[in-house]
């Protein structure tokens, strides 16, 4: 991808997702007119954040760096309190903005801080992980974790823009790229089967941050999410399809105290959801098996502890999709045909889990 590509997210108001390389000038353009900007970044991105700060300063913007903890450990209320304190100290006003720089967790917590500071200030997401690019940065869902579960405290707050700089992929560890692929695979199964065809044609090319396949996979995954979000911004119905595989995934993450990568948990969750659909008579055997084959080809896990189901069931009952104690899952009625399964029999859940159980 030699020229930047823009995907428009048609919410109200709409915003651009700009995909390309060397997007510092685009960031300055998006932030034009702001007097102050707070750059929220993870510790490993201090140097990058300083480059951004200096670039914005050259454009006459008073930019400040705020370092936040890495990964899910940063998605906690004390971290948000610290951010609020610094925003107050630097005097960030309603016509100013926040920039999030980092992975999915940084995007989530920065978005929540932006949604709550002065009842909402603009935020521009600059995701630096594959997961952040195709999932957390697009759609306006923000959140933090509590003892009650993952992302149960949050707000809908659409960004002013998202800048996906593909050059950052080249410095990512391979396992970060592998983990992010789970969300791309999800997009393929729920809406864009071409994604699956591209991965199956050459899984290693799909994982190559210097090649041409991964940028196109990112673009397609962003388009899927943008279209769903535009149709259902506040997750009243259609947007729930983006949670395909996530009910079990969030339960696994909670059981693992958020030490598992989100993408790894989603991978297991996708296979579980496929088996649940198959055993419920809604998904054909070949498509269910295709889940497992594609995920394995990318190096993602497809099994989890055999004895964990009771704990996972308890965690799933706390999922935000649950209604009056009734579990609700997103399943497929065919390739690209997501639907809902409500209140499945415990024996069906146990049978589906047996397909991902690791002894």
Swiss-Prot record:
NAD(+) binds at residues 70-75, 104-108, 128-129, 141, 150. Pathway: Metabolic intermediate biosynthesis; chorismate biosynthesis; chorismate from D-erythrose 4-phosphate and phosphoenolpyruvate: step 2/7. InterPro entries: Dehydroquinate_synthase, DHQ_synth_AroB, DHQ_synth_fam, DHQS/DOIS_N, DHQS_C. Its main location: cytoplasm. Keywords: Amino-acid biosynthesis, Aromatic amino acid biosynthesis, Cobalt, Cytoplasm, Lyase, Metal-binding, NAD, Nucleotide-binding, Zinc. Zn(2+) binds at residues 183, 246, 262. It is an enzyme of class 4 (lyase). GO terms for cellular component: cytoplasm. It is found in: Cytoplasm. It comes from the Bacteria. Its cofactor is Co(2+); Zn(2+); NAD(+). It catalyses: 7-phospho-2-dehydro-3-deoxy-D-arabino-heptonate = 3-dehydroquinate + phosphate. GO terms for molecular function: 3-dehydroquinate synthase activity; metal ion binding; nucleotide binding. Catalyzes the conversion of 3-deoxy-D-arabino-heptulosonate 7-phosphate (DAHP) to dehydroquinate (DHQ). This is 3-dehydroquinate synthase. It comes from Mycolicibacterium vanbaalenii (strain DSM 7251 / JCM 13017 / BCRC 16820 / KCTC 9966 / NRRL B-24157 / PYR-1) (Mycobacterium vanbaalenii). The gene is aroB.
